[in-house]
Amino acid sequence: SLGDNQLTSVENAVLAPSFESLSRTAAIGKDVNHVLVLFGGTDPSGLALSSLRALEDIGFTGKVSCVRGLGASQIEGDFKLDLEMLRDVKNMGALMVSADLALSSAGRTITELLSIGVPTICLAQNQKELTHTHATKSNGVINLGLGSLISKADLAAAIAGLIKDSALRAELNAAALAATAKRSNAQIVKRIFDFLGF
C-alpha cells in the first residue's frame, strides 16, 4: 500500500465480474498459436499497428486477435497474418483465456491478463503508464517501456524471443498467477470496508 489512504497493487485491482469465474491458465504449451493485441480504448500511440507489423515481420503464422477500443481509429492495410480485428468485445476474459501470449499497454488490461496467467509484453502508451508498478517481470510481464520509443526491429525481436522461449513464458505465467492468487473483488471490497471502519 502507498500512504495511509490508498490500497494499491495488483491484489487491490477490481476487475469485471466475468474475470472472477474464469479458469486460470496453469500450463503453458511449447508453441504459441494465438497472440492477443490490445492497446486500450483509443491507442493514441498506434501501438497495435506497430505490434501487427512486428508479428508480420517475424513471420508469425498463428492466429492474431487485435482488439480495438471504441475510441480507437480503424487499422487499415493488408497484413500477412491470420488476423481478426475485434471491436466492442462483450466477454474479454473468454478471449484472453484463449491466448498464448499478449501485447498490451500498461493499464487495467495488464491486470486482467495477469489474473488469467497470460504471458504479456507491455508497451506503455505514455509517460503516466511508465509509473505503473504492476507491469513487471515479477508479475509476469516483459515491460519494454514507452512504446513510441521502441523500434520495430526491437519489438519484433522481443516478440520472437518470447515465442521461442517456452521456459520464460512458463515463468511469466507462474509469476502472474502468484501475483494475483489472493486477488478477488470480494476481498477488495472487504479490505475497503475494513479500511473505512465498517
Task: Label each residue range with its predicted role.
Residues 1-45, 69:
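A nucleotide-sugar donor-handling region in carbohydrate enzymes
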Residues 97-108:
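Acidic donor-binding loop of glycosyltransferase active sites
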Residues 8, 65, 84-86, 101-103, ...:
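Hydrophobic/aromatic beta-strand patches that form the interior of the parallel beta-sheet core
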